[in-house]
Amino acid sequence: MREVRRAQGLSQGDLAGGDLSPSYVSLVENGRRIPSAKIARSIAERLGTTVEALSAAEEPGARLSERLGLVGQLVAARASQLAGDWAAARRQLEAVVERAGGADQDEVRWEAHWELATVLGRLDDPARHEAALRRLLDDPLTRTAPVLHARVAIELAQLLRTEGRLPEGVRFAEEAVRVTADLEPGRPERAQARMALLSASVDSGEWSRAEQLGAELRAEAAPLPAGELRAGALWAVAGAQYLAGHPDEALELLTEAEDQLATTDGVRLRLRLARARTLLALAAGPADEAEALLTRARQATALVGTPASRTWLAVLETAAALRHNDGPAAAEHAAKIDLTAGDLSPLDRARCLLHLARAHRADHHEETAEADFKLAAEGYEQAGAFRLALETWRELTAGTRRAEGTDPHAVLMP
């Protein structure tokens, strides 16, 4: 049925109508619904064929051969990913998605779609990445499998958060938490969903719920083995603890999170976690710990000298100079912040502007500082980080930072 429809250039929506919905057409094509004789005749008439022709089965050997061919292409695409050839992986996965049309090929098609979404993310194509995830979210197989549903919703929540669309990110993270509620304890998806929700909630300014979400995430992370997921969970809980007024515990959690990553290959995650720990230590940690972490950040940047890493080091150096009330040094370091660095999310860009504003104010360039504060606040607002925007406006109006209490701009979430 699917092959006949596609051969005629029809969509499932084109075939639907009257007694048929597009979702029902999809279920029939996937072998998940057996139509009545009346509906089968209706479908055949719309396709200009007969029920007998639609019911003709392929030879089992041909179906098996086709499936094995698709699996082989999927394996080749995975090899391309391991080799870092993302463009080749994309072509191979798109071919699998196009060919996997049989009812017995649902799982292969889903895996290809999922991996294609991942590859599009690595190719820095957020629009197509999002479109691929939304297609997966509407896939009948996704909707009938809570684990698959959760994985897609989590990935979509993280993408939207990175793209500066925090309210949507929170919504999909909440959806992920909801669909994982019935999964058995210890499933990684349960912790992943709660980590996505906590991170998006903190970034968007829903700090009143952060401590409770952190407690739930900590309980979910307890049975997890050492590794990236457990590290990410501890990191997220640390952010909630700091905002709740427990900076010492937050720093201890970040230290534990770094220990969890010691034997993993997640270089990008380790670098960002190190930045988060250093920035928080500069805001609330002992002077010797903050200085040691800053020294390590300098060493890491010397090894990984990307525009983004150099910009983050400039932010950290600026924060350190501000901690020592050294306005000229803060301004000198802030001048090295590159707001065009490609890896900066909208939220991170606003955070960079906030540090620029503080440096200019400390160096007595009030007009420049005011302009930077306004740009930072607007950047936060556009991303949906309304609480951070409000804190920025307050700091601009007050003419100085609060001497006591937490600095929410110092919280980097996973």
Regions found by a protein language model. Give the residues of each.
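Alpha-helical segment of the N-proximal tetratricopeptide repeat
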Residues: L68-A103, V119-R122, T162
